[in-house]
Every structure is written in C-alpha cells, then in structure tokens.
Design a protein with these regions (language model features):
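Conserved beta-strand -> loop -> alpha-helix junction used to position metal-binding or nucleic-acid-contacting
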Residues: 29-75
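Short, amphipathic alpha-helical segments
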Residues: 7-11, 32, 49-52, 83, ...
C-alpha cells in the first residue's frame, strides 16, 4: 500500500524500517540526507550520508561566494567530497584546520554584555558539520560489496517518477 508521510520523524523511520524487516526485507544499507538523529539510529545497518546534501549544508552555512579565505577554502574542499576517498578528504580537512584553526577559533566580546562568542559562527558550523558527519560520508567505501551510492540523487529521481504516476 502507498501512503503519504506528512512529517518525517526519527521514530517514523525506526517504525518503517522495523516493519520492512518484519516482512522479511533485508535492508543492506540506508542512504539519507543527514537528518538529525537518523545517522546513528540504525547501528546494525550501514548508513551513508548523501555527499551532495553535505555540500548543500556547507553552501547554506558559507554561501556560494564566501568572503574570507578560510570559508572559500572550506567551500572548495567540500566540493571535492564526491570525488575524494575518505583518507584523502580527512587529510585535506586536517590540513585546512591546521591552516585556519586560529581564524576558526577567534572570539569576539559583546560590548553590552561582556560575554565572548565565536566570531566566525557560520564557518564553525560548516566545519563542525563536516567533522560530525565524517563517519557516515564514506560508508560506501567501507562496504564495496554492497555498491552503496554516495548520494541520494538516483533515489530522488525515482521518487519524482513515482509521484507523477500517483
């Protein structure tokens, strides 16, 4: 049966995967967009975060034309994600951090309150997103026998076709 899901929730994903498994469906892997809480929900199933969605997250934080050299370099690095291996990407991200750590960790003081805060919040958010998602960005490399795609693009194209048929 087909039904429309109004709101995607982590609990809904858990229920639907369990329902599929109860029907005897063997789920070899899950490819997702990085929805908070979803990446570490299925500990017994390989989960690949869509690399394209990760790039979109970076662009959302940094814009398409970032101003600072650090943000420009991080955006450029993120654009190599889909062509990189895990080892190469992690090494490049570590080099980026070495070069820009001081800038990334700069703090400013609010003159009214006297409290300090990170000066480059959006850059930190972009970098932290990459660091946080690294364990799931290259799952496809860890399980070559499963032929896991690195992005959801193929799936989203199929969903568009199905929606037109409904």
């Amino acid at each position: 049966s087909v039904f429309e899901v109004k709101n995607e929730t982590i609990e809904r994903y858990r229920q639907e995967v369990a329902a599929l498994q109860e029907r005897g469906v063997v789920i070899q892997s899950i490819i997702c967009d990085g929805k908070s809480g979803l990446l570490d929900l299925f500990l017994d199933i390989p989960v690949q975060m869509c690399q394209f969605h990760q790039v979109k997250i970076i662009v959302r934080h940094l814009t398409r034309k970032p101003k600072s050299p650090a943000a420009q370099a991080l955006r450029a690095l993120s654009l190599t994600l889909t062509e990189s291996t895990q080892a190469a990407f992690e090494a490049a991200l570590a080099r980026w951090y070495e070069q820009y750590a001081v800038f990334l960790n700069e703090r400013s003081v609010n003159e009214k309150t006297g409290h300090s805060h990170y000066t480059h919040k959006r850059l930190r958010a972009a970098y932290n997103s990459l660091k946080r998602h690294l364990p799931w960005l290259f799952t496809c490399e860890c399980f070559p026998e499963l032929c896991i795609p690195n992005a959801t693009n193929l799936l989203e194209g199929k969903f568009s076709e199905m929606k037109q048929l409904l």
